[in-house]
Amino acid sequence: MLALDAAPDGLVLVGGDGTLSGILDVVCAAGVPVTVVPAGTGNDLARALGLPLTDVAAAVELALTGLPRPIDIGEVRTSTGTSLFLTVAALAFDARVSDRTNRLRWPSGALRYYLALLIELVRLRPLDFTIRADDGPAIPARGTLVAVGNTASYGGGMPVCVGAVPDDGTLDVVAVGPLGRVRLVRLFPVLLRGRHLARPEVHHLRARTVTVAAPGLVAYADGERVGEETCTISVRAAALTVMTDAERRDAHVR
């Protein structure tokens, strides 16, 4: 990045979660505070930090008036390499929907996502996961999806890892047990309200590192495909400093 060649005191980054995660390794290595100007479709990091979502001037102003806030980032390691992410790593069903959406050439916009969702619902099959959290044993679990969150939401505000905050040094892991098509569809409205953790088919834990493996597993993070089959997801605590609104910070910390 040419901006880093000048040894700046800070960076202003314009983009969505996927754009930002794509340059995380360079930005973190620079060790300077970052001002995020949300310009993506989801902007879930900005939601988690209470940043202005639609007021560009207010977002840029934080470069001068904001409070530096160290936040965690996530790391996904697979057989093909290592990727960094800011929000949520999604594995199994919802990752397959994202994968299908990216492969479809028709229709466009939201209709393409809904068509992908319909196709994957028809093809829905629970997976036989193996999940290991931190130094615990590898636990077999049959299920539909697993989400590992540095923040509470992904996809523009869907609170799959409700309660997760990006500065506690841990990741929130949410696993949904084996569900049929009808039960999975019925779970979505509950998830959108952030009430799914109380359901018996939903399991929640916190960990610094979690390894998830399953035949045919696909993983996405910040909207980008990051691996398959076996994924080890870890937290890098306080790896990035973001300029935030001091008046709104306390409302976004657990």
Regions found by a protein language model. Give the residues of each.
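Glycine-rich beta-strand-to-loop/alpha-helix junction loops that act as flexible
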Residues: 14-16, 39, 150
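Short acidic/glycine-rich loop or secondary-structure boundary segments that cap or lie
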Residues: 94-97, 139-141, 153-157, 181-184
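Catalytic core of DAGKc-family lipid kinases
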Residues: 28-33, 39-144
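Glycine-rich phosphate/pyrophosphate-binding beta-alpha loops
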Residues: 90, 94, 147-160, 225
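ATP/NTP phosphate-donor binding region
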Residues: 1-14, 21, 29, 57-61, ...
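A generic structural signal for short beta-strands and their flanking turns/coil linkers
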Residues: 125-127, 142-144, 167-172, 206-208
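Gly/Ser/Thr-rich active-site loops/lids in small-molecule metabolic enzymes
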Residues: 104-112, 154-156, 161-183
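ATP/nucleoside-binding phosphotransfer catalytic cores, i.e., glycine-rich phosphate-binding loops
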Residues: 133-135, 140, 165, 175-254
